[in-house]
Amino acid sequence: MKKTTILNAQLSHVIATMGHTDGLTICDAGLPIPTEQHCIDLALTKGIPDFLSVLQAVSSELFIEKIVLAEEIKNINPQIEQQLLMVIQQIEVQQKNTIKIEYIPHNEFKHQSNQAKAVVRTGECSPYANVILYSGVPF
């Protein structure tokens, strides 16, 4: 049995095959995901698993150089935004790098999300609890 954090085979495979600047979207239960997009659906019930727990698990195995958020999160869901930014600060300390943070309109976020290597759907039922993680290199 795998010893490290992520036990989900699909998610572990996607992370292992990501290269520099590849994107991985972690989203709430409501983000539209095109049929042709590689979707790793972790949603079990409302809130399970939650967005931040999935982000923390993914960040334990993925070196992150940049994140993209929908700018609407600032006004509509500032609680999740602040919690997410705290997690990003913790990741920066662990990785010993600065993670670039970019805010874009939600419609543009959906377009960029469609370009990601995969979308990880959580059970989060909180508006704009979505992030695109861009892979960096740990050297």
From Swiss-Prot:
Transmembrane segments: none annotated. It is an enzyme of class 5 (isomerase). Pfam families: RbsD_FucU. GO terms for cellular component: cytosol. Its EC number is 5.4.99.62. Signal peptide: none annotated. InterPro entries: D-ribose_pyranase (IPR023064), RbsD-like_sf (IPR023750), RbsD_FucU (IPR007721). Catalyzes the interconversion of beta-pyran and beta-furan forms of D-ribose. Belongs to the RbsD / FucU family. RbsD subfamily. This is D-ribose pyranase.
